[in-house]
Amino acid sequence: MSKVTREEVYELAKSRSQELVKLVSDLIRIPSENPTGTQREVVDFVKKYLSDAGISCEEVSCNPDYPCVLAKIGKDEGFSVILNGHVDVVPAGDRSQWDYDPFSGEVTDKLILGRGTSDMKAGVAGMLFAMKVLKDSGAELNGNVRLHIVSDEESGGEYGSKWLCENGYAAGANACLIGEPTSNNTIEIGQKGGLHLVLKSKGKSAHGSLGGFKGDNAIVKLGRVLDKLQELTKIEGHYKDSQAHALKNSKLIAEQEIGEPGVGEVISHVSANVGIINGGTRPNMVPDYCEAIVDVRLPIGVD
C-alpha cells in the first residue's frame, strides 16, 4: 500500500465537512450541564461514535457521574500527542432569556447555535472527527494520537483532566492539544490557572429601621473588601523571554478580535470576578452574615 500523505488526509477531511457540522450539532443537542445536569448521555454518544468508527475506547473514572473516555490510534512507540476536550457545559440558565433553544444545535448559513458550541463541543467534535478521518485514511503514524474526553471541566475538573494526570493516563505523552476556543487561526501556548475564593463576613443583626445606627451590616463590610479586589488586576505574571514574545502577539490579537484597547492585558495579569453573593434574610433586617465567591485567574509566575 502506498504511503498516505498529509495532503490526502486533509482532502479527505474537507470532503466530509458536512459530517463534522452534523457531529457538532448532535453533541449540542445532548444537554450536559455541569454541575446541574448529567454527563451519561453525552459520554455514551462519544463512545458509540468511536466504536462505529472502528476505534476501540475505554471509560475510566473515579466518579461514575463524571466519566472520561480514552482512545488511541497508531503505534505504542514514537511521538505521542494527546487530544484533550471536555463535553460538559455551563448551565443555560433561564431559557426564556435565550433567542433560541440553547440545546437545538440549529445550523444557520454561518453559525451553529447552542450552549457549549464553542466551549467546547465544536472542539470535541473536531477531535472525534480527526480520529475517524485518520483511521479511515489508512495513514501510518510514526507515533500515536491519544484522545482524552472528560466530562468534568466547568466545575473545576477534579474528576476530569486533573484526575487523569494524577493517575498516570497522560504518562509518556510528548504534547497535548486542548480544543478550547481561541482566536481564529491561532494556537495558544498555555492557560491561566484558576482559583475560587470564598469570602465570608460576620456582623450583628438589628431591625432594618435602625440601619446605620445599630447593628453591624455584614453585606456592607464584605462590600468594602470586594471593592479592593480590583487591586489584584495590577499583579502581572513573570515569563521567560520566549513566553513574553508569544504573549505580546496574543495581546495584539486579542485586542483586534475583541475591539477593546487594553483588553489584551488580561492575558498577562490576574483577573478577578465576583460571581456569587449571598447574604441577609429580609430587607427589614440588618444582615449578620454575607458570603461571596470570587473567580480568580492566575497567569504564569503568580502563585
Q: Which ranges hold each PLM region?
A:
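Metal-dependent amide/peptide-bond hydrolase catalytic core
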Residues: 2-8, 32, 58, 196-303
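Acidic/His- and Gly-rich active-site-bordering loop/insert found
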Residues: 2-113, 136-141
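Catalytic metal-binding/acid-base residues of hydrolase active sites
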Residues: 33, 88, 154, 182, ...
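Hydrophobic/aromatic beta-strand patches that form the interior of the parallel beta-sheet core
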Residues: 58, 81-83, 148, 175-177, ...
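Short glycine-biased active-site loop of nucleotidyltransferases that positions the nucleotide triphosphate
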Residues: 72, 187-191, 284-285
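Fold-level recognition of mixed alpha/beta catalytic cores in primary-metabolism enzymes, strongest
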Residues: 112, 117, 122-233, 253, ...
